[in-house]
């Protein structure tokens, strides 16, 4: 019996060591990639006090956090509502890029671990699954460097996704055996979940809406399985709705639409995407035949 237990423990230790080694390897690889790429395109704009995407006159360099807050008010009014991501974007311009390289590599590593957590929760350690997730995290992404390595995009997509998946952990770990928390703890957790939900919904237009849908599906699942729905589950959803509303109601969204010449008719957009889908499907069918 003891020898069997020792064997199980040894296997667990080996698997945990393998997980740590894989995560460390991914961190190191992405750190190298981050170090090979400098700033580009919109990155330079955010080194200065934000007055709009069209620079007029001589731009003034950021001098501190106060300049960032002032710029984000302008950003919300004339560009878009992605304030948390762009606040961090400007904040990291105050440091050497090596700081961003390290933190961004950590976020890439965390993304893989969080996906693994959600996919493998309450199951034995699955090393092949973790390897597949990290491989697909890069190979399955269209232009991965544009989402993970490019300075401006990393804040908007990589970092926000990590935050959302972390927020959703509090729905994933819920089960029927969980004891009802003390009222004082539930109040604190409810407030924290509301705040976390606001920032999860206030990420970007695609992921904010997806997060709201994911939380709703969790609550529906809890109801079907007759699992208790706690107050913090509800306040989390209210937070996501609030954050998503702040994002969508930004005056800058309307300003950007007014400054573009793209078609605004939603039906024409849907028909255009339908035609593209039919074309791609036809090409794939021909290739299969």
Residue ranges of model-derived segments:
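Hydrophobic core segments of transmembrane alpha-helices in multi-pass, intramembrane catalytic enzymes
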Residues: 104, 108, 156-167, 210-218
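Short hydrophobic alpha-helices at membrane interfaces in multi-pass membrane enzymes
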Residues: 173-198
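Structural signal for the C-terminal ends of transmembrane alpha-helices
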Residues: 32-33, 114-122, 140-141, 169-179, ...
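Transmembrane catalytic cores of multi-pass membrane glycosyltransferases
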Residues: 32-94, 102, 151, 201-289
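Membrane-interface micro-motifs in multi-pass membrane enzymes
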Residues: 128-175, 204
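Start-transfer (signal-anchor) and selected internal transmembrane alpha helices
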Residues: 1-29
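Membrane-interfacial entry segments at the cytosolic side of transmembrane helices
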Residues: 12-15, 182-189, 224-238
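Transmembrane-helix motifs of polytopic, lipid-linked glycan transferases
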Residues: 102-128, 166
């Amino acid at each position: 019996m003891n020898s069997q237990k020792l064997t199980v423990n040894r296997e667990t230790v080996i698997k945990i060591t393998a997980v740590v080694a894989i995560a460390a390897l991914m961190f190191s690889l992405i750190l190298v990639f981050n170090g090979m790429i400098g700033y580009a395109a919109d990155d330079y704009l955010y080194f200065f006090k934000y007055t709009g995407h069209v620079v007029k006159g001589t731009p003034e360099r950021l001098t501190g956090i106060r300049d960032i807050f002032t710029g984000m008010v302008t950003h919300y009014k004339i560009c878009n509502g992605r304030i948390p991501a762009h606040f961090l974007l400007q904040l990291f311009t105050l440091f050497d890029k090596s700081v961003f390289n390290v933190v961004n590599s950590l976020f890439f590593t965390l993304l893989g671990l969080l996906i693994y957590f959600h996919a493998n929760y309450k199951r034995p350690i699955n090393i092949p699954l973790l390897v597949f997730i990290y491989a697909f995290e890069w190979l399955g992404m269209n232009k991965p460097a544009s989402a993970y390595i490019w300075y401006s995009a990393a804040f908007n997509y990589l970092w926000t996704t990590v935050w959302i998946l972390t927020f959703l952990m509090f729905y994933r770990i819920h089960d029927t055996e969980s004891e009802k928390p003390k009222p004082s703890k539930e109040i604190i957790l409810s407030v924290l979940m509301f705040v976390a939900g606001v920032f999860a919904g206030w990420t970007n237009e695609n992921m904010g809406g997806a997060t709201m849908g994911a939380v709703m599906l969790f609550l529906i699942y809890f109801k079907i399985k007759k699992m208790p729905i706690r107050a913090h589950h509800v306040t989390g959803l209210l937070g996501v709705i609030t954050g998503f509303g702040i994002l969508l109601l930004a005056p800058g969204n309307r300003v950007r639409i007014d400054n573009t010449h793209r078609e605004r008719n939603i039906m024409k957009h849907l028909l255009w995407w339908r035609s593209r889908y039919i074309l791609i499907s036809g090409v794939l069918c021909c290739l299969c035949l």
